[in-house]
Each structure stands twice: as C-alpha cells, then as structure tokens.
Amino acid sequence: MIQMQSMLDAADNSGARSVMCIKVLGGSHRRYAHIGDVIKVTVKEAIPRGKVKKGDVMKAVVVRTRKGVRRPDGSVIRFDRNACVLLNNTTEQPIGTRIFGPVTRELRGDKFMKIVSLAPEVL
C-alpha cells in the first residue's frame, strides 16, 4: 500500500534512484495505491546525467510493494521494497529502456505491456 509521502525505489534506468509519492491518482479521496496503480511522484535522489533530475514531478506505476498482491488461488506475492517505474507524463509510457527486478503478472494489460516485456522476470 503506497500513500502520500511513501518513499519508493525507481526500478528502471531513467536516472532516478529514489522517489516520493505525492499523490495517488484515480479518485478525489483515494488514499492507497497498489501494484499496477499510477501515482504522482517527485524525484528525491538521481544519478548524474540521467533522463530525470532531482525535483522533477512525474507519473509512475507501482510494480512492487511490501504489502504484496493476493492471487485468486489464495497465494500472496510480497517484496522486500516498494518500487515503481517512471512514466512519461503525457503518453504514460516508461521513460527508461530497462527494468530492474521482477514485476507481477497483474501489470499485464493494454497500458503496461511494455513494462512486462522489458522486465527480466514476471511473477
């Protein structure tokens, strides 16, 4: 569960290292974001010569959470850290060309098929 002020790792090569959630998109009083939800983030730590810099406000999709996701068969997939992939603000396509770490099958949809295809492992 990601809410405002939550810190996340950037799971791509966009240049951001850590980001902070500043808004959960999709409803006026929506409080929590789960895997596959789009959030608004600000870059808190970035590497030199990256595509984004510290202070940039971007959209991002949550790909890993400590809370995890429950499958219809009753199993739960949890991760050690919260992580997201930064998106272009207008097209909502990933900024980076590589994805680091596993992503879940819940991202398989029309919107995020690119992220699933770039990921090294889909759980």
Swiss-Prot record:
GO terms for cellular component: cytosolic large ribosomal subunit. It comes from the Bacteria. Keywords: Ribonucleoprotein, Ribosomal protein, RNA-binding, rRNA-binding. Pfam families: Ribosomal_L14. Binds to 23S rRNA. Forms part of two intersubunit bridges in the 70S ribosome. NCBIfam families: rplN_bact. This is Large ribosomal subunit protein uL14. It comes from Vibrio parahaemolyticus serotype O3:K6 (strain RIMD 2210633). The lineage of its organism: Bacteria, Pseudomonadati, Pseudomonadota, Gammaproteobacteria, Vibrionales.
